[in-house]
Amino acid sequence: MQEFEVVEGIEKGPMTHLRIEIEDSLTLKDNYIYAHIGKQEYVYSLEKIEKIVLLTTDLGPFYDDMGLAIDVGNDTAIFIMSEHKCFNDFLFEQIGKVLSIDYQKVIEASSCIERKVFEIYRKNS
């Protein structure tokens, strides 16, 4: 799975990066985000989300060319790539129904072929 070298849209510094790999899952239920990574479950309140960005690469079509990064506060970010089975449901059917996602930025990111960061949500924006 493609990893991003620098995550410009998420604050730099000592952060915990939780990566949702192919065998893992990411869901939203009852205002809580559930990240199942390996045998570990991470749970975050929806209220803790500071920012959500879409990251694009210039590596398509052989690698995932878009990823979602969710800043859940406490120096923790969750990452999921666009080809993951949970990506579309999480973004459009779950988180997109409860937060004010900037869908114009989602469209721009979807058509981008460069390395770029698109902020699609910021708390109190």
What is each residue range found by the language model?
Residues L18-I20, S25, K29-T57:
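Phosphoinositide-binding peripheral membrane targeting modules
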Residues G9-K12, T16, Y32-A35, N74, ...:
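A near-ubiquitous, low-amplitude feature marking generic local secondary-structure context
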